[in-house]
Every structure is written in C-alpha cells, then in structure tokens.
Amino acid sequence: MRTVSSYGVELRKQNIPIRQTLDIYRSAVSCLIEIYAQIWDELAVITEPKNRFNTAEHLVHTTKKNQARFDFDLRFPKMPSYLRRAAIQHALGSVSSYKTRMELWKKTDQKGGRPKLVCDNHAMPVFYRDVMYREDTEEKDGACLKLYDGHGWKWFRVSLSHTDMEYLRKNWAGKKAAAPVLEKRHRKYFLRFSYTEEVPLTKTPVKEQIICSVDLGLNTDAVCTIMRADGTVLGRKFIDFPSEKDRMYRVLGRISRFQRKHGSAQVKSRWAYAKRLNTELGRKIAGAVTGYAEENHVDVIVFEYLEIKGKISGRKKQKLHLWRKRDIQKRCEHQAHRRGMRISRICAWNTSRLAYDGSGTVVRDPGNHSLCTFQNGKRYNCDLSASYNIGARYFIRELLKPIPVTERSLLEAKVPSVKRRISCVYADLRELFLEMELLRAA
C-alpha cells in the first residue's frame, strides 16, 4: 500500500522576502483565474488534461514560437517556469470546480446558495528542487530558496529549525520526498515535506489474527484489548491523559465565563487555543494506541464506526469529544498503515450498552460513568466491556463471511444472537467459535 506522510519544518525568523513572494504568487493565481473564467468554453472542449494545460499555458506565456493572447508575462515578469505552471494548474482547478458546481446547482433547481468564483485565494507556492529549492552545502540545517524581493527573483539562504531537520534525518532519510510547499501557521512559516512509502499490509488468515479493539470513551481516552479469534484476551490497556484534559477543560471554563460576561463576539482566539489543545491530545492518544498495537504484533486495529458527519447538536464539550474521536481514527489509520497493520470498523450500536458476558443491558453508576453494574450484579468497567464487544463483533463478522450459506444457517441456529450484529457481544464469539470447532470435528 502506498502511504504519503508530511512534516512541516519551521523557517527561522530572518530578513527574507517570504511575504512578498507569497503575495505575488497569489496575485498571479488570481489573474489566471480571471483569464480562464473568461475563455473557459474554449478550454472545456479539450478533454485531455495535459493538452488543456498546454493550451492554457500558451494563452498566457510568450515563447519564440508562440505569441500569448494575454499580457500575463508583462504583469509578472521573469516568474520561474515551474512556479508559473503551478499557478496555472491551481487556476485551472479552481475554474473547473466552479463550473462543475454551477452545473450541479442548476440541475438541482437552484437549491441553496449560488456558487461563486473566488479570485482572492489562499494558494501556497511549491518550491521545486534545483529550480526553487536547493539544500545548503555549507550549513547542515540550511537551504536556499528562490524568492521575489520586489524587483526580481533571487536566491536567499534560509535557516531551518534544527530539531525539525534532525527529525527528518532520523526518520525519513532515504525515503522518496516531494517538492516542499510553503505553509503558514500561527504567524510562522514552514516548509512542508511530503514522503511516499510502499508498505505491504498484513495478510494473516482470520483465525490466526491478533487484533487490538479500541473503545474511544468520554471517561477514559481509549481502552485497548488484544484479542485472538477464539476470544482469548492477551492484554488490556487504559490510555488516559488527565493533565491534558484538565488543561483543556480549564480553557473551556474560561471561555464559558467570558461569554457570559461579554458575549461570543470576542472568543475566536480562545476557541482556537482550545482546538489546538484538543488536536494535540488526539495526536498523543493515536500514538499511544498504535504504539501498543505494534508492541503486541497486532494485525488489525478495530474501531467503532462513528456517525459524526454533519451538524452535531449539544454542548461544545461534546463537540470537542467527537472532533477528537474523528481525528484519532484518522491518525491511527495512517500510522497503522505505515507499520503494515490494517484498520477495520464495526457497528457501534449497543457496544457499551450490552454486557460482554451476555447478561443483558448494563446500568451505569450515576457518579462515575466509567463503572457499571451487570444484570447479574457484577461490577465492571464499562469502556473495557465495550472494547471486548468491539473485538468480538469484528471476529464474528470475519468468521461468518466466507462460510457457505447452509453451514452459516446451522451456526446461526445454534447461536441465534449472531444473526443481528447490533446485539452481538463477547460471549457470543466464544460460543460461536466453540460451535465452529465442533462442526468441523464432526
């Protein structure tokens, strides 16, 4: 499987014309968007992307054999060719997207707002190697960038963050790297390097697999269970970062008190800080989950399928929890694929509501929602019970999938609860695996 990872290296503060370069590149993209919007009917006839791009470039760039129709070269003289082509590609994509959205809007009887062609863009330039970007031979943590200083395009030596460069040298040496892209975050500039890897994913048969079932809860950040196909539990781990959550909840409390006094008009920066804390917490949880799975030589990491698309009603705290769950699953998926592990998702209905031993629904403690009481009086951790059920539902699905219909009907007759996936629990997996072994022995 091909995986693409990226890492941003901070540009140290120094007197280089980064802002001027960014402004002229965005101005060039805006100019090209206006040009191609006027003559899109001519370009739309050309279906081949490469031919369309060549035609678009000939319209704005003059050569010995071509006279441009528009004065783009006069407005942006001596712009590097690779940077000009990147701007052309960005402009073509913007206009094409606008035209497609406009057609869809007309087909839907003009429901919703009319699409707009936005020329004021947030495009970021790409520093192509050897043409726009060179590694500094004199300084280990330096590079040379071709920037616009207000008069022309010149080479400038820049210093990069030592810790960021050490990370790249340690973890990404020898990997295929793409051209770096300029990025601005929190009033700082970064060069984002992208790396491509070819990683073979595990192909272990289901009955020999070891999985890590993960329950992302509100009380504990994550509960991981290492499980085999017969239901044997090899390990359990509670992942929690209480200090980080306390810091975030203190910030949310300050936001709440501020909004009660002054309204919600001036809390944008405070919410941005809370979101950054939430994102950092998601990174730590995802790293802990994949690290624990790798320690136990796991083949598949199993999550609940969370229906978190669209608008979510409720308090901001709950929204932050849902944002973090989505972020954790995305990060875990990427990190697991880099390590050769697979990701699977199961139906989340009733995983926490039903006891893992098959005794029925659980009753959560009113004071501590992480603990619950089973119908038989047993006290247990609710998130741990849910992680057992998550792993069991994965194995029940994968064990029954390749079996012929007649054999599956016999098994479902002996274990009726596996017919409905939303009611399957850990005890059903143990019973199903035992019946499969008896059927095979017979």
Regions found by a protein language model. Give the residues of each.
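Nucleic-acid substrate recognition interfaces
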Residues: 1-442
